[in-house]
Amino acid sequence: MSRGDGYPKNIFLLCRDSGVPFEDLRLQCVFCTKELTSPELAAFCIRELNVVWKSGAPYGACARCLLFEGIKRRLKYWQYSCFVEGVEAETNESIYTQLIRCYMCHKPLVREEKDKHRNEKRRLHKISGYWRGSCLYCWSRCMGQSPR
């Protein structure tokens, strides 16, 4: 989603290049233009999302819009679903070497989350040409149970 060569792609680089400390950084949401709160900025960093550049200005995404956009993208651009073994056969690559994000919050899945998909025979979803799954937080939120 990051557009603009020569511009910092993530919040860490943006802070470094602009000389603005993280605590003082102010970004607007690219979708709703609301200013991101400090926890939303931190979550944006943890999710390893790219800064979006419009007319030379950097934008992030608030938690509400990330969730909404994830649901919208899944409904509009879902292609098909496969078990882990099917994804690995299709891509000729282990899921552990692939960047697979949560389709709800967009966080990259870690090994434990990928293992959970494999061990519990949960499907991964091809959405907009990318493989997506559920992180432990969204998994528990959707299933109404604790993540462990």
UniProtKB/Swiss-Prot annotation:
InterPro entries, A to Z: E6, E6_sf
GO cellular component: host cell cytoplasm; host cell nucleus
Zinc finger (unnamed): 29-65, 102-138
Compartments, record wording: Host cytoplasm; Host nucleus
Family note: Belongs to the papillomaviridae E6 protein family.
Subunit text: Forms homodimers. Interacts with ubiquitin-protein ligase UBE3A/E6-AP; this interaction stimulates UBE3A ubiquitin activity. Interacts with host TP53 and EP300; this interaction inhibits TP53 activity.
Annotated protein name in UniProt: Protein E6
Origin species: Human papillomavirus 29
Lineage: Viruses, Monodnaviria, Shotokuvirae, Cossaviricota, Papovaviricetes
